[in-house]
C-alpha cells in the first residue's frame, strides 16, 4: 500500500486524534500517511444545539463523502460523536485505547459541582450532561455552549459561565489537564457512549485496508464500546435524548452501567448488568430498561 489519506476535522482536538492514528499507522504498519482536513456542518453551525440541527452525523458527513469520492481512505472520530448506525457501506475498523471517560467540571471560581452557589450558570449543550446535572443540582441554570474546546474555555474565561462541562479525554489530549477542577464521578454523570475512545472509520469494501487497520485495534476498547453502542442502538438513542452508558472490562466479564433521563433531570433510571457477550449485554440491558419505562422517561 503506497499511502493512506486520513480525513479529519480541523480543530486542534480532531488533529491531535488524527495525528495519533497517523503516527501509529506509520510506525506499526509502516505505511506513509497524509492528513486531509475539512470543515463539517457540525463545525460551521454553532448558534444552535446539535439536537435541533441534525445530530452527531453532522460531524462526519463531509469526511464520509471524501471517502466515497476516493479523496480519503479512512476518517478519524471521537467515538462519542459517531451515531449508533453508520451509513451503508461504512464500518468502524479500529478502536484506540480509551482515555479517561469521565466528564470534567471546569471552573475558575469553584472547586466542584457541590461548591457551586444556587443559580450558578453552567455551560453544556449535551442533554445527557444537562439532565444529570439538574438531577444532582436542580438549583443550577444550564445554558447552551457550542464550539471547539478552546472556544468553550474562552467563553468561561470571559465570564459568560460560572463553570462548564467538557470531556476529560479532550482536555488531557490537548495537555490542558490543569483546567480540570473536578473529574465528575460516574455516579453523578455517567459518560456518553464511547466517550474517551478514538475510532477509525473506513469503507466496508476496502478489505485490504481493513485487514491492516485491524492490527491497531484495542480489544478492550472494542469490547466495551460494542456493549455501550449495542445498548444505545437498542434504545435508538441520539443526541436528542439524555442517554449515558459506560462499560468496564475485568478479565472477560463486562460490567455495563446505563442511564436514561428526562431532559429536565426530574426522572432518571439507572441500571447495570454483567455479561461476557458485549452485543447481547447491551441489548439485554436496554430491553430491561425499556420494560421499566425508559421510553416514557426519554419522552418526558
Curated annotation (Swiss-Prot):
Name recorded for this polypeptide: Porphobilinogen deaminase
Gene3D superfamilies linked: Periplasmic binding protein-like II, Porphobilinogen deaminase, C-terminal domain
HAMAP family reported for this sequence: Porphobil_deam
CDD domains linked to this entry: PBP2_EcHMBS_like
Role of this protein: Tetrapolymerization of the monopyrrole PBG into the hydroxymethylbilane pre-uroporphyrinogen in several discrete steps.
Entry GO MF terms: hydroxymethylbilane synthase activity
Modified residue annotations for S-(dipyrrolylmethanemethyl)cysteine: 239
PANTHER family assigned: PORPHOBILINOGEN DEAMINASE (PTHR11557:SF0)
Misc remark: The porphobilinogen subunits are added to the dipyrromethane group.
GO BP, one annotated term: protoporphyrinogen IX biosynthetic process
SUPFAM superfamilies linked: Periplasmic binding protein-like II, Porphobilinogen deaminase (hydroxymethylbilane synthase), C-terminal domain
Pfam families: Porphobil_deam, Porphobil_deamC
Transmembrane segments: none
Record-level GO cellular component terms: cytoplasm
Database matches in InterPro entries: HemC, Porphobilin_deaminase_cofac_BS, Porphobilin_deaminase_N, Porphobilinogen_deaminase_C, Porphobilinogen_deaminase_C_sf
Enzyme Commission number(s) of this protein: 2.5.1.61
Catalytic activity entry: 4 porphobilinogen + H2O = hydroxymethylbilane + 4 NH4(+)
Originating species: Francisella tularensis subsp. novicida (strain U112)
Amino acid at each position: 500500500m503506497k499511502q493512506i489519506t486520513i480525513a479529519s476535522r480541523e480543530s486542534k482536538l480532531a488533529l491531535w486524534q488524527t495525528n495519533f492514528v497517523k503516527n501509529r499507522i506509520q510506525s506499526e504498519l509502516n505505511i506513509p500517511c497524509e492528513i486531509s482536513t475539512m470543515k463539517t456542518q457540525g463545525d460551521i453551525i454553532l448558534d444552535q444545539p446539535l439536537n435541533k440541527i441534525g445530530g452527531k452525523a453532522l460531524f462526519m458527513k463531509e469526511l464520509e463523502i471524501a471517502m466515497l469520492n476516493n479523496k480519503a481512505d479512512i476518517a478519524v472520530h471521537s467515538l462519542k460523536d459517531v451515531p449508533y448506525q453508520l451509513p451503508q457501506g461504512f464500518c468502524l475498523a479500529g478502536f484506540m485505547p480509551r482515555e479517561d471517560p469521565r466528564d470534567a467540571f471546569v471552573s475558575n471560581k469553584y472547586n466542584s459541582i457541590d461548591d457551586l452557589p444556587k443559580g450558578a450558570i453552567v455551560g453544556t449543550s449535551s442533554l445527557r450532561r444537562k439532565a444529570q446535572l439538574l438531577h444532582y443540582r436542580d438549583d443550577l441554570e444550564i445554558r447552551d455552549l457550542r464550539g471547539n474546546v478552546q472556544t468553550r474555555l474562552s467563553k468561561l474565561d470571559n465570564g459568560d459561565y460560572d463553570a462548564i462541562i467538557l470531556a476529560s479525554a479532550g482536555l488531557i489530549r490537548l495537555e490542558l489537564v490543569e483546567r480540570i477542577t473536578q473529574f465528575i464521578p460516574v455516579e453523578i454523570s455517567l459518560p456518553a457512549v464511547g466517550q474517551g475512545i478514538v475510532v477509525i472509520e473506513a469503507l466496508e469494501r476496502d478489505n485490504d485496508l481493513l485487514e491492516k487497520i485491524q492490527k491497531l485495534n484495542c480489544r478492550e476498547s472494542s469490547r466495551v464500546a460494542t456493549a455501550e453502542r449495542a445498548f444505545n442502538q437498542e434504545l435508538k438513542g441520539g443526541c436528542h435524548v439524555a442517554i449515558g452508558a459506560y462499560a468496564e472490562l475485568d478479565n472477560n466479564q463486562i460490567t455495563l452501567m446505563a442511564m436514561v433521563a428526562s431532559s429536565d433531570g426530574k426522572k432518571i433510571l439507572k441500571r447495570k448488568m454483567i455479561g461476557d457477550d458485549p452485543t447481547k449485554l447491551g441489548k439485554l440491558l436496554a430491553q430491561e430498561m425499556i420494560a421499566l419505562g425508559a421510553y416514557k422517561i426519554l419522552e418526558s
